[in-house]
């Protein structure tokens, strides 16, 4: 690895990148300073088994690099780049994720429902201690949002599959085309396994607009079943990372894309990196705008202003009277949030937002069943999903050892 990159890190005593910036609490200063390549990989995988992925797609400016002490006097340390380089090098040189077998866990069986980032992390950390782990995945391949959400131009599938194979090499069994609420019964699994971790995400479309040629961004990105967007005018409604991914994907398919967002750019939940990359792709932005109706290619809009409301953490968009205007669109793609699959979680106690309710140990209302990631309403980034998987694996381990 480039020595200059290593030396740029100040090796701060307080480790803000690790303790304040990283949701997973990766041992960032340690893996940066470690000159032994295999030991550096060991440090990375002591907290995250998806370093090659997170090192490429994390919103660094909002997390580790955003609080980097170096960033106060210049550019922050390239933490993501270093992490990805360590993991890429490990795969090239055949380094494996280490095991730490606990004899008391070798007779235990755990089912992981959902093979996305959270499920993979939990599965890997249990398997490396000797637990017999089976992943149940609804698609014909693992990855979740990594393979059915994030576009190829942001994350190469080859990288994702190499990372997944490293985890599966720990001895994990996978059963594909298995979906809870369809051909997978939670009660039957409770009888077969000592514990279950539910990490199925929350990808059901939140369709808030009526009309033809309206699509869910989540569904388009998940199934890759795109209409012919070439030379068509497309509006993407939303301001998060999914909106940016959808807009850039449609732009790459030849569409004329405009993002419509009801707040200002500074209020966008998307990462700074994603917003800048979307602009670089020549996607147009229409801020402080609400879509009211869509009919026969006419999008009726109204301008908004942001107002402060008591008990609200964010300013709230308010329609401005007499500010209506129209846009033209052949298609509208909605990226205004997603919802849990109601059928899949019908037997669980829910929180006030409709997600599965868990306690501080990630336990649900069902016996032996834990849950994490988007399905419990966790912040929708890969790093937070991985963090849930790591924490849940520790809680499941303690549960199994009782």
Describe the function of each predicted region.
Residues 1-109, 196-213, 329, 338-340, ...:
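Ferredoxin-type iron-sulfur electron-transfer modules and their immediate structural context
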């Amino acid at each position: 690895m480039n020595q200059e990159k290593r030396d740029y890190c100040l090796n701060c005593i307080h480790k803000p990148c690790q303790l304040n910036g990283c949701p997973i609490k990766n041992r960032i200063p340690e893996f940066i300073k470690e000159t032994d390549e295999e030991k550096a990989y060991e440090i990375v995988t002591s907290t995250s088994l998806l370093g090659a992925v997170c090192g490429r797609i994390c919103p660094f400016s909002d997390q580790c690099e955003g609080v980097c002490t170096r960033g106060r006097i210049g550019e922050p340390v390239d933490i993501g780049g270093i992490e990805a380089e360590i993991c890429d090098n490990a795969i090239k040189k055949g380094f494996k994720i280490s095991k730490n077998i606990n004899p008391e866990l070798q007779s235990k069986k755990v089912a992981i429902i959902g093979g996305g980032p959270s499920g993979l992390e939990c599965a890997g950390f249990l398997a490396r201690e000797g637990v017999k782990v089976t992943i149940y995945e609804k698609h014909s391949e693992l990855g979740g949002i990594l393979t059915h959400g994030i576009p190829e131009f942001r994350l190469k599938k080859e990288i994702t599959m190499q990372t997944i194979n490293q985890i599966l090499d720990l001895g994990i069994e996978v059963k594909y085309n298995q979906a809870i609420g369809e051909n997978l019964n939670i009660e039957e699994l409770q009888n077969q396994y000592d514990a279950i971790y539910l990490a199925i995400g929350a990808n059901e479309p939140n369709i808030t607009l009526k009309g033809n040629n309206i699509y869910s961004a989540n569904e388009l990105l998940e199934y890759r079943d795109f209409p012919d967007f070439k030379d068509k005018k497309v509006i993407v409604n939303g301001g998060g990372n999914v909106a940016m991914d959808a807009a850039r994907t449609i732009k790459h398919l030849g569409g004329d894309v405009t993002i419509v967002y009801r707040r200002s750019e500074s209020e966008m939940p998307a990462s700074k990196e994603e917003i800048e990359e979307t602009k670089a792709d020549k996607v147009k932005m229409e801020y402080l705008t609400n879509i009211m109706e869509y009919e026969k290619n006419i999008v009726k809009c109204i301008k908004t202003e942001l107002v402060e409301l008591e008990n609200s953490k964010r300013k709230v968009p308010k329609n401005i009277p007499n500010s209506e205007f129209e846009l033209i669109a052949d298609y509208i793609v909605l990226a205004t949030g997603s919802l849990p699959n109601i059928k899949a979680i019908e037997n669980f106690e829910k929180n006030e937002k409709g997600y599965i309710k868990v306690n501080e140990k990630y336990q649900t209302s069902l016996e032996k069943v834990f849950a994490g990631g988007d399905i419990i309403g966790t912040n929708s980034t890969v790093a937070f999903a991985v963090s849930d998987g790591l924490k849940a694996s520790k809680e499941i381990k303690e549960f199994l050892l009782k």
